[in-house]
């Protein structure tokens, strides 16, 4: 690592440590914290504000449990310091049982305004409209893309898409029904594109991008930038998208979910062999790649491990959550001087079948 990057890494770590202190102070202070974390602090018999002074101190807390967000009174997650504000409740996809829920006020706006700074104004031109070809319903993504479009001076046009119906079809083995529903969503997108020539940008998933590109030449319809997220963003698909599905169009892959927000990708470099390397939006969220057998230990660079997420905002504190994804641990880079996650895929060690549907 060169000295300039090493200095950036150190500064980023100091910023993360300071942010951890601020967020822990907020969530575990009786005047501002939420009932859930204040009760947990009593249960642990731990003065969290005293014990957690930097990011590494979060190891003193147990891993965040998946089931904590599944059901239960959702207001237990509302910090007292934010009471009285208009709220949203967003759900995860529900591909592994009861959906997880997250209360939000402004986090989705902040996350996507920050993400907007990484987009090219040439290929995602300000003032242009967007097509949202992705999940609707109780997911944060639809409102987030809408806000991203508005933040950049445009309007977002959305299809009506229920991924849970697709998952039900696939679990029942009804592939034909699932494909009909996918075509129904693509038909909606085609109708929107034909009626709105100011659409230059779009969000979609790998499977839906492929289905749409089979029907039309996206560049001929004026699309100049594609923001793509989902579980099928392999190096093979990445190359296929750039060379076959959307040649000449700026292809921007992301990794994200309702709990984290979204991670941006390291700028495209042919030497990466089309591997997509993501970097979390520190200090608001941090990702570590840990050993599948010992989550207290990071794997060496270049090795595959399980993704461990920590979310650090005033609206949401999620420490050391073991995601259902695996990735290759990658080193810091100039734009993002902290660890990256390469070639993210569903984690192989869960022992449960995960149906991804339209993603």
Where are these regions (language model features)?
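Nucleotide 5′-phosphate-binding alpha/beta core
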Residues: 1-91, 97-129, 134-138, 151, ...
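Active-site glycine/GP-rich loop and adjacent strand/helix microenvironment
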Residues: 1-26, 152-359
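Glycine-centered flexibility sites
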Residues: 33, 45, 93-97, 142, ...
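Surface-exposed charge patches
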Residues: 39, 147, 239
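Short, conserved acidic/polar surface loops in the N-terminal third of protein domains
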Residues: 101-105, 141-144, 169-170
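Conserved short alpha-helical elements in the N-terminal third of ANL/AMP-binding
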Residues: 142-156
